[in-house]
Structures are given as C-alpha cells and as structure tokens.
Amino acid sequence: MKNNLIILLILLVSFSCDQKKDNTNESYDLVILNGRVIDPETEFDDIANVGIKDGRIVAITKEPLEGTESVDATGKIVAPGFIDTHFHFQTPIGYSLGLRDGVTSSMDFEMGCAGSYIADWYEARAGKTQANYGIAVSHEFARAMFIDGSDGADYLVNGPIAAYTTRAKTGWSQTRPTLEQGNAILEELDKGLQAGAVGIGSTVGYMREGVSSREMFEVQRVAARYGRPTGAHTRYTLGNDTQENNGAQELVSNALALGAPAIVLHFNNSGWRLAHQMIIELQEQGHNIWGEIYPYAAGSTTINASFLEPESWID
C-alpha cells in the first residue's frame, strides 16, 4: 500500500492502548508500522505499531507485527477519523474532500433533509463513497412544506441544497403554524426518523419569530421518542452573550426534561464560555448533551435569514 499519506486515518475502530498488546504473534489483515499513534479518548501518544484484523484494531504495541498488508507510517500520525456533525457538502466530491481533511464520518445535524425524502437521500449515496454519512430530518424543510407549500422530489431530496429553493419564500422563517400545520410538521419529522434520519436538525435561529417555544419542545419530543438527538442552530444566534446562552439553554432544558440527547451547534459565539461550561458539567452528570465549534468567524447564508434583519443584526 502507498506509504506517502500525510495523515493516516483508521475508520470505525475503537482505540485503546490496553487492547491485547500480547497478541504480537497473530497474523493480521493490516499492520500500520512506526507511526505516532494518538488516541484523544485515552490520551495515548507514542510511536507504536497497530494490528488490524476483521476490521478492528486488536493490537497497539511497540513489538514487531506482521500482516497480509502493511503501511509504513514513519513520520505520520495514526489516529481515529474525525466525525463532523455539521457537514453540508454531502456529495461524492464533498465526501472525498472531507476524507482528505481527516473526516471519515460526515453528518448534517443542522439543516438536514425533508422527512419524506430521507430514504431517497440515503439510496442516492449507497456505494458511492468510502466515507460514513448520515443526515438529520429537517425542521426547517418541514415548515417550508406545510407553511409555504414547498414540495418537489427534484430539489427536496438534495438536503441542505434545497434551501436555495425553499428560502425564496418567508413563511418557513416568520410564520407561526396553525394547529393542523404544526401537527403535519411533527408528522413529517417522525416520518424522517422512521426512514433512518440520525436525529432532528433545527435552524431555529433562522426562524426565531416563526417557531414558538412550544413548537421547539414538541420537535425535540419527536426525536426523544427515538432516543435520537436534536441539533440546533439555536435561537438568538447571532446575538449578544446573554441571548446566545438563552438560546442554548432552551435546547438543553428541553432535552433534560425529555431525557433526550442534544447538540448545541457552533456555540463559539458571544458568551461561549458559559455554554461550554454548561455542556461539560451536564456531561459530568451523565447527560448526553454535547456541542460543536467551528474554526472560522462567520459563514455565508441566505439574505432573508431573520437574524440578518437590521433590527436583529449584531455587529
């Protein structure tokens, strides 16, 4: 195998520096030799050899290993692949670029895909990438379907890209649904979870006027029935340090009341230290609450997002 990889990534395997170090006489399917093995979970960091059999790591050791195939990782880092929970570029070329950046599992827990098209979304990607992939069912697209009348397999099956069409209208963002519309939105989310969505993705921060606190709670309740997370671009983002944390607290308090997981998306805005402290302390108490950050200050979005309105904009 080629040995000129910049970063060598191991996919869907569990790392442990205590794993079967004495099995150095085994025959392995693949051995990775002389690399700097780093496991963030166990804090293992040393030059070592890795033995893989039947798709799993069975040895991490300084002893010599032999296998059917070998990779000389001298001067390289051997580490688990990254899981990106906020990956919108879910196309073959997007996955390919992600793999080159170390992302072996690409998920979209923010925008997602319309529930009625989740099965088609997965089918369109089957066998076409080496990456792991998944997508949430979209709160925003459910609102667009039943408030604005957006529908069409030609674009809604495309997940986040569909926003270029649905956001031409404004009901998805600004309108409170009727009782009938609200129930239809929840049914659409349930349909997506039944079809394999990894959770619910909500862009409530784009829909702060249209989505009531009751609606957000009921959206998270749907995910809770399946034990799956709701990821949210939280309400009041962009906002000041108090508003940002109030948005995170809405998502988290709903999750705690429902006994459900939650992901506070890109919480590194104003007041992020409090959001981080809240997440860490809840994790220490055993709650499945987590968050993500991005390494950049801002990204592009559609001009009719509610937080870009002059009365809402925060410099």
Question: What are these regions, as identified by a protein language model?
Answer:
Residues 22-32, 37-79:
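Histidine-rich, glycine-flanked metal-binding segment
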